[in-house]
């Protein structure tokens, strides 16, 4: 079954209900289905496997989890538009150093030689808020998403870092306030290019 943008013109509230029903029908009837969509959340919800097609080439074909958390190219990162790439230097098999964020630990998605200069992908859920931290950046934007906020923080080097915070968090920050980042920084998947 081929579905080309089947839910693109449906009201958001109704769309989620239709997605749930569509997924159940596809699973219950065991229909092999290709769904073409520009909505990554829709693709991640409906698919067992996602393919990212850019410039008429298949850039990544993997589980929704891996496409989001372990994108295999800068092109896929830019297509998903969920994070920012910041410069860093690999300091050990499980850590790297960023001039503004300091040491960041985790598991590299692919190996790099110690001393390599890389671009580290930071996604909104990778950094954590901490009012007591001495690592602070200015809030330049704040998006309310119902269950969460996405804060945009500007660094001294003019990078804009997205940070996810649950909307029930006691202290909400406003534009131009300082926002603390929890240290030490640990990111499960260190995705670098």
Residue ranges and their predicted role:
Residues 6, 14, 38-46, 58, ...:
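A general secondary-structure boundary signal
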Residues 1-75:
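ABC ATPase nucleotide-binding domains
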Residues 63, 75, 89, 136-138:
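Residues located in well-ordered beta-strands
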Residues 56, 62, 81-83, 88, ...:
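Glycine-centered flexibility sites
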Residues 83, 94-193:
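Non-catalytic connector elements of ABC transporters
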Residues 69-93, 121:
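C-terminal boundary and immediately downstream tail of ABC-type ATPase nucleotide-binding domains
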